[in-house]
């Protein structure tokens, strides 16, 4: 998996990801909210994700595996 593109808009970092399950992420450095858009079109917002953890997620060899292990069941989330 790899980051296809990255856009920074104010406090938001938007990444399009080449992954089987994850299509796109949006991270707000101010609110620490992470929005993940999956390949099936569903979007979820995760609260209070530390910036350092988001950076590790972006740089990981397998974002899908990192997400499943360190984010998906660790942080409060809602479907949006």
Identify the residue ranges that each predicted region occupies.
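Acidic/histidine-enriched, beta-strand-rich ligand/metal-binding domains
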Residues: 1-80
């Amino acid at each position: 998996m790899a980051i296809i593109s990255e856009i920074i808009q104010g406090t938001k970092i938007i990444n399009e990801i080449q992954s089987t399950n994850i299509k796109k992420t949006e991270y707000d450095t101010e609110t620490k909210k992470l929005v993940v858009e999956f390949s099936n079109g569903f979007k979820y917002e995760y609260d209070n994700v530390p910036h350092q953890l988001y950076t590790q997620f972006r740089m990981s060899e397998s974002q899908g595996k990192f997400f499943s292990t360190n984010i998906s069941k660790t942080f409060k989330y809602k479907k949006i």
